[in-house]
Amino acid sequence: MSLTYMNMFLAFTISLVGLLMYRSHMMSALLCLEGMMLSLFVMMTITILNIHLTLASMTPIILLVFAACEAALGLSLLVMVSTTYGMDYVQNLNLLQC
């Protein structure tokens, strides 16, 4: 395993641990999800370039589009929750009230 793959795997793991540990605030959870998607994008791009797989060259772009959609939906949900309740604590959100 090369140093680049280890760094990307470490970035993904740190983002996953951050998502599991700091899930009380919605903003920190969204930042950790973005870190996970960015490391997946870089790892997928490097893998496709290394094995010269031209048929799957659009796959990282599709992943990046899904990451952008996830970020837009997450930020709009964060704005809605923070204007409605005045905080971004995930524990205080009840699905029965929304």
Curated annotation (Swiss-Prot):
The chain crosses the membrane at residues 1-21, 29-49, 61-81. Its EC number is 7.1.1.2. Keywords: Electron transport, Membrane, Mitochondrion, Mitochondrion inner membrane, NAD, Respiratory chain, Translocase, Transmembrane, Transmembrane helix, Transport, Ubiquinone. It is found in: Mitochondrion inner membrane. It is an enzyme of class 7 (translocase). It comes from Rhinophylla pumilio (Dwarf little fruit bat). GO terms for molecular function: NADH dehydrogenase (ubiquinone) activity. Core subunit of the mitochondrial membrane respiratory chain NADH dehydrogenase (Complex I) which catalyzes electron transfer from NADH through the respiratory chain, using ubiquinone as an electron acceptor. Part of the enzyme membrane arm which is embedded in the lipid bilayer and involved in proton translocation. The lineage of its organism: Eukaryota, Metazoa, Chordata, Craniata, Vertebrata. One of its GO terms (biological process) is ATP synthesis coupled electron transport. Belongs to the complex I subunit 4L family. Its main location: mitochondrion. It catalyses: a ubiquinone + NADH + 5 H(+)(in) = a ubiquinol + NAD(+) + 4 H(+)(out). Core subunit of respiratory chain NADH dehydrogenase (Complex I) which is composed of 45 different subunits. This is NADH-ubiquinone oxidoreductase chain 4L. It is a multi-pass membrane protein. The keyword Thylakoid does not apply. InterPro entries: NADH_UbQ_OxRdtase_chain4L/K (IPR001133), NUOK/Mnh_C1-like (IPR039428). One of its GO terms (cellular component) is respiratory chain complex I.
